[in-house]
Each structure stands twice: as C-alpha cells, then as structure tokens.
UniProtKB/Swiss-Prot annotation:
One of its GO terms (molecular function) is dTTP diphosphatase activity. Coiled coil: none annotated. CDD domains: Maf. It is found in: Cytoplasm. It comes from the Bacteria. It catalyses: dTTP + H2O = dTMP + diphosphate + H(+); UTP + H2O = UMP + diphosphate + H(+). Keywords: Cytoplasm, Hydrolase, Nucleotide metabolism. The keyword DNA repair does not apply. Its cofactor is a divalent metal cation. Its EC number is 3.6.1.9. This is dTTP/UTP pyrophosphatase. Its main location: cytoplasm. HAMAP family: Maf.
Length: 193
C-alpha cells in the first residue's frame, strides 16, 4: 500500500500530541523522538508558506548528524498567517486572548511545512488551508482559553476543539493541516518512496 516504506524506520520528531494522533491514523509503524530545542527564527525575507517549510528543515537538520541509514525522519511546523503576519504559539493567557480577538470575524491561512529526511536525501513541502472565523464574543474567547489552554497551538486555537465547533465558519483545504499535519499530502509523498 505504501510502496517501499517498509524499508524505513519512520521517526516522527515532534512534541505535538496532535501530530502523533494523526500519524497513528495512517496505520504505519513509527517511533516518536522528542524535539531538541531548535531555533525557530527565520530570515526576514521569508513570508507565508515559506516560513514553516524553512523551520521544518531546521528541525530536521538538528537531527541529521545522529540519523542512521534506513531511518526516515518526519518534521513539521505550523503557522497561522493573518494580514501578512505570523501568529505562532501565544505567550501566556493574555497572548492567546489577543490572538483570538485578532482572528474573530476574519479569514486567515494555516500553513504547515513538512520535511522528510534520510541520511541520503531531504524533501520538504507545504500545505495551505483557508479558515474563516465567525465573530467571537469576549466571553467565548476567554472561556475557550481558560478551559482548553491553547498555548501550545499556532494561532491559539485547535480547530478540533470547542472553538472550532462554534467559531469556524468555513474551511478550504485540509482540515488535518489545520490540526498540524497535512496527512493526505504526507501520505501521497510517502507512497512515492
């Protein structure tokens, strides 16, 4: 079903429980390695879709020196792109509240960069999804932030959580990309190996 994938030991280098959940849904055997501290800054001339792809390669490069032949490393990074600016993970409760206020009643893009790496080659790609939020009340925003603690999520929200149920008006593109891993696109790339 997945071509020559059985010749690789698949390693998901991620601290994200959502990426682990999505990988498990593919039904492939894989192991998880915790990400070391990786500098997630990026060159100022990058914009939008280029940013998470660049960071996913940086994450892969942090592992490259310890990789063994036969290993296939998967790294990813997700950003929310609103009005030409990156919304990464919020800093604290008030940062999350501010991000959700800025998303309320607007459309934005979610970009996830994915990097596939072996000792012999590296390939990266980006997926994009458009998300439109309904207008959120201050009460809804604060309820969500207090109950769901979205400080580990780009844009301060999980589309699969309460805020997605009540606030997401429309989506164009991959739902799973918004969760943090464009699993259909990843599956297509893995089939090519």
């Amino acid at each position: 079903m997945l071509g020559n994938l059985d010749k690789y030991q698949i390693i998901l280098a991620s601290n994200s429980p959502r990426r682990k959940e999505l990988m498990s849904g593919l039904g492939v055997d894989y192991v998880v390695r915790t990400l070391p501290d990786v500098d997630e800054s990026y060159p100022a001339d990058l914009a939008g879709a280029e940013i998470p792809e660049y960071i996913s390669r940086e994450k892969a490069d942090a592992y490259r020196s310890i990789m063994q032949p036969g290993e296939l490393l998967i790294t990813a990074d997700t950003i929310v792109w609103l009005d030409g600016k990156v919304l990464g993970k919020p800093e604290g409760r008030e940062g999350a509240v501010e991000m959700l206020r800025s998303l309320s009643g607007k459309s934005h893009q979610v970009f996830t960069g994915v990097c596939l790496t072996t000792t012999e080659w590296q390939k990266s790609f980006t997926a994009a999804s458009d998300v439109e939020f309904d207008v959120l009340s201050e009460e809804e925003i604060r309820y969500y932030v207090d109950k769901y603690q979205p400080m580990d999520k780009a844009g301060a929200y999980g589309v699969q959580e309460w805020i997605g149920y009540i606030g997401v008006k429309s989506i164009s593109g991959s739902f799973y990309n918004i969760m943090g891993l464009p699993i259909q696109k990843l599956y297509g790339e893995l089939k090519k190996l």
